[in-house]
Every structure is written in structure tokens, then in C-alpha cells.
Amino acid sequence: SSNLQESGQAFFESRPVKHRGVLVLSTDKGLCGALNANLFRVVNEVDASAKFVAVGKRATQYLSRTRRDLLADFTVSDRAPFSEVRKVVEFLLHQYLEENFDTVEVAYTSFVNTLQQEPEIVQLLPFSDLETMLATLHARFGSPDDEIAKDSREILFEPGRGEILADLTSLYVKQEIYQLILESQA
């Protein structure tokens, strides 16, 4: 129980960065040469001490060819079912909690419009604060109903705040990575 509580808090604790953890999301299609080339240009700027996780054959090939520290590679089908993404996220969270790397970042191609896709790297962990995380969720899914927000009754959380925080942060990271995978496949 306290271990879960600690893992929830670990997602918010900033620690000295010895190793960045970078998830690289590439396309598998051969006709997207510039898309992957631009993404790999951004990945190439990441310092050599970083540890990488790849989603997509092209990312795996690139990271192997450039002799980067590739911890794992995953394949996510075109439909990107959440069950496939869950394996990736659970691996990343485990590596982060075991302190094999001190950040979780995602290198992906951001879809601007059909003619413009921008490669970028976003940091997911550690979280800056809970308010930022909630604001992101509200922006994506809408704010809670005002009547619910005004309810001042005290709520007893079971199993406990620590477990809920750990689950909430884990779900948030899963949802964010899932969204980035969908966006990079657009």
C-alpha cells in the first residue's frame, strides 16, 4: 500500500537527470520518408546518455543503426488498440519507478494539418504539478459539470488517496501516450 502511495508521488518528484527516457514513435510505412527523417533529426540531438524505447520498425532500425541505448521496441498496429499501448506505457512506468531513467519523454510527429507535420519531443514525467495535469485533461475531455464541482460533501476514497493518485497518474500517462500514437499515425 505505501509502495503504491510512493509510486504516485514519484511521478511528481523531480530528480537529477542522469538518464533521459525517450519513447520514439515512428511510422512503419515506407512512403513517409521525410516524416521519419525529420523525426530522427530531432532524436539525433538527444544526448548520448539517454535510454530509448521504440514504437515502429523505422524507430527500432534508426536507434539500432545509430547505436543508441535501446531498452525495448514495440509494434503497435495501425488501429492502435489501447491494449497494445498499455504494454508500452507499463514498461515506461516500470523503468521510471525503478529509476532506470529520470524523465519520460516522447519524440513524435505532431499533426498540424495534412501538409504540415512537426517533429517534437514532449516531457510526460515527472509531472510539473497536479493542476497542470488536470487542466490538460479538462481541455481534452471538457470540464466537470458545475453542479458536481459545487458539491462540498466530504468523500471517503477507497482504497486511499495514494493508490488513487498512483492510478490517476498512470492512467494519465497511458492516455497521453495513446493520444500521441494516434496523432503520429494521422
Walk through the language-model features, giving the residues of each.
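C-terminal beta-strand-loop-alpha-helix "lid" module of Rossmann-like NAD(P)-dependent dehydrogenases
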Residues: S1-A186
